Amino acid sequence: MAERELYPDGEQRRRIMDFIMAAGQSLLENGAEVFRVEQTMEIMAASFHLREFHVYVLTNGIFASAGTAEMSEVRNVPTRTTHLGRVAAVNQLSRQIASGEVDTIDEAETRLAQARCIPFPKDWVQIAAGMGGAFCFALIFGGDLKAGLAAAAAGVAASAYLLFCGRHGVGGGFKTISTASLITLICILSCHLLRTEASHAIIGTLMILTPGIAFTMGIRDFVQGDYLSGTIRMIDALLIAASIAIGTGLVLGAYSMLTGVVLA
């Protein structure tokens, strides 16, 4: 701890500030709650004796200052994913910094870089998860085994398509609308071949797109008193839900126009 107290102003303070901002960005863009991002950054600042540190976090940005407003920094966080392994690694790093186990900024920067490089699960694991989730949801919503198999096929296609979109920078509403359309189309075709109702398969597979995390974290932000972040997350959830409805409705409408059959 003595080494921390001897940190000079200037370049070393800037390094500490940049490190704390990078840690906060890593937490926010990988699915951490807003109040936990603020709390973790404040703990790191206090542990490294960065005086007069103040931080304000939104769902897509971080604002922080240190000293008598001599240092300030803003970071935009436009994209958010969910990688709880990275969140856990950064949280563990903050605890080790607070306890003195990690007591230099050099070691802290190295550990943070390692945490940010933790890979996502392999493609086949994500595809298998999508397949299993769609199959189980189809059965939960009243579908038979055939509907579950149709949902599993759609889940595989949807998961593979989402991975493709992630690698090629396709995001926003278009990704959700096109994925929902793909799911609906595959479920209709699969259920036609298997001679079973498509509604349960469609609903079950669409569940893998539902914005459960955004909705839940929005409610949590409201409970914590952060109404702005809560509103942003709730709007995100509503937009995703609307995109799912649009994508599904387009395919169902086209199917009804071409065949004259309205799926219940």
Residue ranges and their predicted role:
Residues 119-199:
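Core alpha-helical transmembrane segments of integral membrane proteins
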Residues 190-264:
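Generic detector of multi-pass transmembrane helix bundles and their immediately adjacent loops
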Residues 35, 107-121, 173-174, 199-204:
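Cytosolic regulatory modules rich in charged/polar residues
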Residues 1-102:
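Soluble N-terminal domains of membrane-associated systems
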Residues 114-115, 158-171, 216-229:
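C-terminal ends of transmembrane helices
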Residues 79-147, 236-245:
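Alpha-helical transmembrane segments and their cytosolic membrane-interface
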Residues 1-16, 118, 246-264:
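N-terminal charge/polar-biased segments
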